[in-house]
Structures are given as C-alpha cells and as structure tokens.
Curated annotation (Swiss-Prot):
Entry's family note: Belongs to the anaerobic G-3-P dehydrogenase subunit B family.
Lineage: Bacteria, Pseudomonadati, Pseudomonadota, Gammaproteobacteria, Vibrionales
GO molecular function, one term: glycerol-3-phosphate dehydrogenase (quinone) activity
Cofactor(s) for this UniProt protein: FMN
Superkingdom: Bacteria
Keyword Phosphoprotein tagged: no
Function per UniProt: Conversion of glycerol 3-phosphate to dihydroxyacetone. Uses fumarate or nitrate as electron acceptor.
Keyword Glycoprotein appears in the UniProt entry: no
Gene name as annotated: glpB
Subunit structure, interactors included: Composed of a catalytic GlpA/B dimer and of membrane bound GlpC.
GO biological process terms, semicolon-separated: glycerol catabolic process
The protein's name: Anaerobic glycerol-3-phosphate dehydrogenase subunit B
Length: 436
C-alpha cells in the first residue's frame, strides 16, 4: 500500500491548488487525475464574483461577500469567509507569478472587464499580462481586430459588431485586419481545419513569425488596442507575446478561442510544472473508482490502473468537478457523486431543476446542485460526516459558477481553505520540543 500525507483527487484548478499548497507546506502529496481538465476550455482569467444570486452586478468582489452571506449562507464563499478567500486568491497569484505566469488585478481590488471572443464584456478579477483590463474608459484611439486567414475558431466580425454596441465605444473606430501566415501548406491538411495550437507551432518558424510582425506593424499604431486570438502557446506563449510586443511596439489583448484554449493551457502547464518540480507524485491518466471507509474516516482509495495497490493517506481532498468533468452525474431522476456516493443536495422533483425559459434572469436550480458539505467542507455519506475528506471546487453545492461568475475563485478559495485546515491538524498534533 502506498501512503501519503495528502491524496488529491482531480487535476483541475481546485485539485492543483490543493496539491500545491500541501506540497509547499512540506507534505507528501499524490495527485490523481483522469485526463485533461476544464482549464483547456477556460478563458485563462480568474473570476472571483461577478454577480450576486439576486442578479446584482458586483464591482468589488470581496466587499460583496457579506451581502452574499446574507443571500446564500450555504455558498462556498460563505463557508470559507472573506479573509480566507482573499488569502487563497493572493496565494494563487504568488504561486503563478513564481511559475512565470504573472496575473494582474486592479489596484483598488475591483473587478475589471475582459473582452470576450464574442465581443461581450465579462467581469473578472485576475488576468494574464496580455488581457486588457477594460473598466469603461478607453485609453486607446482605435480597436484593431486581427483575423488570420484560414483560421475558423475566431469570428472577428461577430466580436466587432457586438463590441460596437457598447455606448462608450460608439465613437471608437473598429477595424478588422486580415493577416496571412505562410507555412500552412506544410501541414498537409485543409488550412481551415487548423487549431490555435497548430498556429502556435507554425509561428516557431522564423519566416512565419516575421510575416506576422511585418503585417501587424503595417496596419496598427502604438495607440491602438490590437485584439487577436490566443495563438501563442505550447509552453512559451507569454514569452512570445512579450517578444511580439517588443518587436511591434503595439498593445495587445488576447482572447481565448475554441478549445484548446492556449490561455487556459498556460495556467494548467504552470500548475503541473510547479507540482512536479516541487516533488509531488502525479498519477496522470488514472481514475479513482472507490474507497474504503472505517467509521467517519476514509482509509484508502482504489484506482482503475492500480486495482491491487490501494493508496492511503492521512487526509484526502476531492476536486473532481461538476457535470462536465463527471464529478457529478445526472440520471433521469437524480444527481449522484459517482466515486464514494457522497450525499448530494438536490431537488427530488425534476420539474423544479430548471426554469421554464432557458435564458432566464436567475440561475437554473440544477446548477446549484452538488455535494453537501458542512462549514469545514467535509462531505457526508449516508448522513455521516467524513472527517478526513474535504471537497472543493465545482462539485460543491450552493452556488452557480456560471451565473455568478465565480468558478475559478471558488475553486481556489475552497482548495486553499481545505488544505489550511489539514495543516492546522498537523500543528495541533505536533509534539513540543524538549529542551535539555
């Protein structure tokens, strides 16, 4: 049997955050994840809180947590608290900074808007260096939207038309510029089938890189905001974006594209690299299929690839995600947590799972379904609390990450809070030094 201090189940942003925090504290950590996480589909920004459950828009996310506590006392933020939520987010920022993916937030602690691929504005709190933090006051003379010939995963006309609906941008010129990148013929496939990661590889060629720089400098000025799809990546995206800015002297705003999202991949690669370099053990491509329980404790877990070799730990953190990641499974009449059969908060009347209208002014109820936890994020199983198991991230009940714009923030805050409680148990059991 393999034994660890902390075993983390799930390799998304919550799972990696929990594993890294425990590893930084000197614990022996194993991380088990089945495959690619939802970070491959993410914007690469961290949303803390964009709206309250009643639909009120949030400007200062941490200040709004007191109002959130009143509206949703079972919300994960309400259980973690403002102080620990802030500490968790700032810890994450420092961790990514040290992994060479610096994230920025507004000096006054407010949300900023990021321009999405659809040309809408979305509240967020932490963004990557080449995501323009728009707050309603344009400090650019024009918006230049880059269209790459043959690349279908970015629709510049849609972005331009939607962005032009903003009243404060009504008098700001918006131009679409077409850019051709040589070398597509070397891929031996239809250039219209290329993805962002294909273009990222292509731009490693000097001729393709120089062609991109030359075309951008011919059409854009330093006082423009140049919006382009995130096509710099595959391990060195931020370095290449910095190089592009230095060569062209232009100001860029990257927008994520259809998956794979290179902005999200940057974060996952940074977290993975930090975990492995820190000495963590990762079972990638494996899946936890069950566990052994003794009273109120989880004593061991079993994986699909290591059926005859159970993994035991003093503490377990579960971050298997929601429906998308199969951390929750929905049948015709019920929602289940499929690994340990943990108790799930849900409405037994399926007719009450959603509103009559798909596009509704309030959150659909099924989005708030998830694993039931106590104030310390311990789940229960058949009504009995599991004392050495913590749940975090999208599998939790009591919130809607999409409607409220808080998915990344909740994942980080709950993971950090869970591990801080684990570390506190070690501090309590530490034997006092004997002075001779």
């Amino acid at each position: 049997m393999m034994h660890y201090d902390v075993a983390v189940i799930g390799g998304g942003i919550a799972g990696y955050s929990a594993a890294l925090r425990a590893l930084q504290a000197g614990k022996k950590v194993v991380l088990i994840n089945q495959g690619q996480s939802a970070l491959h589909f993410s914007s690469g920004s961290i949303d803390v809180l964009g709206r309250l459950p009643d639909g009120s828009v949030v400007n200062q996310p941490f200040d709004a947590l007191s109002a959130l506590q009143q509206q949703a006392p079972e919300h994960p933020y309400s259980k973690v608290g403002r102080k620990n939520s802030e500490k968790g987010l700032m810890w994450f920022k420092r961790t990514l900074d040290s992994a060479h993916v610096p994230l920025h937030h507004e000096p006054d602690g407010a949300n900023h808007w990021r321009i999405t691929p659809l040309g809408t504005l979305k509240n967020t709190w932490l963004s990557q260096p080449f995501v323009y933090p728009y707050r309603g006051n344009a400090d650019f003379s024009r918006i230049m939207i880059v269209a790459i010939d043959g690349y279908r995963d970015f629709q510049p006309a849609m972005l331009r038309d939607n962005l032009a609906q903003r009243p404060e941008l009504a008098n700001t010129p918006m131009l679409t510029v077409n850019v051709s990148i040589p070398g597509f013929e070397g891929f031996r496939r239809n250039p219209n089938e290329l993805r962002s990661i294909d273009i990222a590889r292509l731009l490693r060629q000097e001729s393709a890189w120089n062609a991109l720089c030359d075309q951008l400098m011919r059409v854009a000025r330093p006082d423009d905001l140049v919006i382009m799809p995130a096509i710099m990546g595959n391990g060195d995206g931020l370095h290449l974006m910095s190089k592009l800015q230095q060569v062209t002297q232009l100001r860029f705003h990257e927008v994520p594209t259809m998956p794979p999202s290179l902005l999200g991949i940057r974060i996952e690669e940074a977290l993975h690299r930090s975990f492995i370099q820190g000495g963590g053990v990762q079972l990638k491509g494996d899946k936890v299929i069950g566990g052994n329980f003794a009273g109120s404790r989880l004593t061991a877990i079993h994986t699909q690839n290591l059926r005859d070799f159970p993994i035991s730990a003093e503490h377990y953190v579960m971050a298997t995600g929601s429906y998308f990641s199969q951390g929750l499974q929905a049948s015709q009449h019920a929602i289940q947590e499929p690994i340990f059969a943990l108790d799930v908060q849900q409405n037994p009347d399926r007719a009450q799972w959603r509103h009559a209208q798909f596009i509704a002014a309030q959150s659909h109820p099924f989005m708030t379904f998830g694993v039931t936890t106590d104030a310390n994020l311990h789940p229960s199983r058949q009504g009995k609390t599991i004392d050495n198991l913590w749940c975090c991230g999208a599998m939790l009940s009591g919130y809607d990450p999409v409607f409220e714009g808080c998915g990344g923030g909740v994942a980080i805050a709950t993971a950090y809070h869970a591990v801080e409680q684990i570390l506190a148990t070690y501090a309590q059991t530490k034997q006092p030094e004997v002075l001779l």
